[in-house]
Amino acid sequence: MSYESVARRYGRAIFEIGKETGTLAALAREIGDASAMYSASEELRLVLDNPLIPEASREELLRELGGRAAFSDVTKNTLLLLARRRRLAALPEIARQLALLVDQDQNVARAVVTSAGPLSDGYLDRLRAELEKATGRKISVTHRQDPSLIAGVVTQIDDQVIDGSLRTRLSSFRDNLLRT
């Protein structure tokens, strides 16, 4: 089931509360942490999503988890509201939507850089600087390795992909040879 539209509404509401109270970064971190806890534990999901378990028991469990994690009242109340409305399964998407809103608010773009092998920190810093200059936004870089690229780098920012991999160049070269 897709929770994207529900998650957008909850994400927007949490974002606005965070902006109004000056706690946006903390709320985003807490919602992300709550999402990670929910996603990581199948047992927790089974208990929290089970309609046969009394609502009071589920809420008690959420209060205890929120207390142990030192979540703010806003985060704890959000989790309780999601539980009452049977929408806890939307929590990972809510966290994602909230992170997108925070990035947009702070003019941050997330770049995924994929290379065949490891890249030095210096190279990633230079790449980040060039991407920031090209986009006019602050860039957060995540590096991944994919040996199938052979050599080169593939960079993805939002929906834009810059493919400088040897695999793509060889594939393009092969296609050109076959056409002639």
UniProtKB/Swiss-Prot annotation:
GO molecular-function terms, A-Z: proton-transporting ATP synthase activity, rotational mechanism
Source taxon at top rank: Bacteria
GO cellular component: plasma membrane; proton-transporting ATP synthase complex
Ion transport keyword on record: yes
Compartments (UniProt record): Cell inner membrane
Keyword Cell inner membrane: yes
Main location: membrane
Membrane topology listed for this record: Peripheral membrane protein
Keywords, comma-separated and alphabetical: ATP synthesis, Cell inner membrane, Cell membrane, CF(1), Hydrogen ion transport, Ion transport, Membrane, Transport
PANTHER family: ATP SYNTHASE DELTA CHAIN (PTHR11910)
Purpose of the protein: F(1)F(0) ATP synthase produces ATP from ADP in the presence of a proton or sodium gradient. F-type ATPases consist of two structural domains, F(1) containing the extramembraneous catalytic core and F(0) containing the membrane proton channel, linked together by a central stalk and a peripheral stalk. During catalysis, ATP synthesis in the catalytic domain of F(1) is coupled via a rotary mechanism of the central stalk subunits to proton translocation.
Subunit (UniProt): F-type ATPases have 2 components, F(1) - the catalytic core - and F(0) - the membrane proton channel. F(1) has five subunits: alpha(3), beta(3), gamma(1), delta(1), epsilon(1). F(0) has three main subunits: a(1), b(2) and c(10-14). The alpha and beta chains form an alternating ring which encloses part of the gamma chain. F(1) is attached to F(0) by a central stalk formed by the gamma and epsilon chains, while a peripheral stalk is formed by the delta and b chains.
Full protein name: ATP synthase subunit delta
Organism of this sequence: Sorangium cellulosum (strain So ce56) (Polyangium cellulosum (strain So ce56))
Organism phylogeny: Bacteria, Pseudomonadati, Myxococcota, Polyangia, Polyangiales
